[in-house]
């Protein structure tokens, strides 16, 4: 029921968060948009939001009013996608082939997967031609070897239904691993705990899950 966003100004490796916020209670009474700018300005108001397209339109309208001449000024849009199955081990530019693979992974993430897809579809409709990139929570964990990701169940469940250990919160674990390596001066071995809306623990060796 929520879409979160951040607006970045990016130039030659430098980036700054101009604004961030969310549209909450999508499809429910009392839906609202909340925005916090980098200068401390905060904005919140109720607005009727029936679906993810309405939410993204509300975000683009607000950003166009406060930070952009128009939404077409955006150079690219990044999407956090929940599941990339075994297709993706890194972020990718979204095209028809990528979308087909994302649709194919929906049975692996039936609760949240459709919402991620709706976001891409809405942005494609509202900003046709703007580059879109998908980052997958499961991508970081594609380095896990088969003995570690295989469950002790009949092999056909993996071969036919793709039931295996995938790993999640990969973008968070990857970032934490990089920062830990910077602090300790080496990659090494780490146990990384992600504690947020969900929780997960990952063993990381030499920067890999």
PLM regions and their residue ranges:
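Short glycine-rich, Thr/Ser-proximal phosphate-binding strand/loop in the N-terminal lobe
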Residues: 2-49
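Conserved active-site "lid/cap" helical segment
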Residues: 29-75, 105, 119
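Conserved active-site and cofactor/substrate-binding residues in soluble primary-metabolism enzymes
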Residues: 50-54, 93, 97, 114-118, ...
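Short beta-strand-loop/turn "lid" adjacent to the catalytic site in phosphate-handling enzymes
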Residues: 63-112, 131-133, 140-148
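Non-transmembrane, aqueous-exposed alpha-helical and coiled segments at domain scale
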Residues: 71, 118-119, 127-129, 200
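A gly/proline- and charged-residue-enriched helix-loop-helix capping module
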Residues: 101-119, 123-126, 160-163, 167-174
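Glycine-rich phosphate-binding loop of actin/hexokinase-like ATP-binding domains
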Residues: 140-209
């Amino acid at each position: 029921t929520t879409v979160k966003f951040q607006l970045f100004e990016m130039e030659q490796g430098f980036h700054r968060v101009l604004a961030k916020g969310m549209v909450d209670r999508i499809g429910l009474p009392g839906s609202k948009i909340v925005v916090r700018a980098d200068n401390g300005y905060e904005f919140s108001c109720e607005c009727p939001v029936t679906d993810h397209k309405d939410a993204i339109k509300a975000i683009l309208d607000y950003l166009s009013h406060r930070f952009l001449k128009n939404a077409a000024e955006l150079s690219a849009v990044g999407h956090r996608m929940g599941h990339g199955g075994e297709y993706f081990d890194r972020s990718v530019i979204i095209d028809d082939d990528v979308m087909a693979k994302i649709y194919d992974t929906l049975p692996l993430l039936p609760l949240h997967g459709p919402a991620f897809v709706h976001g891409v579809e809405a942005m494609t409709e509202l900003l046709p031609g703007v580059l879109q990139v998908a980052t997958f929570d499961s991508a970081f964990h594609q380095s896990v070897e088969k003995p570690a990701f295989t469950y002790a169940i009949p092999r056909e469940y993996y071969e036919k239904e793709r039931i295996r250990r995938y790993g999640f919160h990969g973008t968070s674990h990857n970032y934490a691993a990089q920062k830990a390596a910077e602090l300790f001066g080496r990659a090494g071995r780490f146990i990384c705990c992600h504690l947020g809306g969900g929780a997960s623990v990952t063993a990381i060796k030499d920067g890999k899950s």
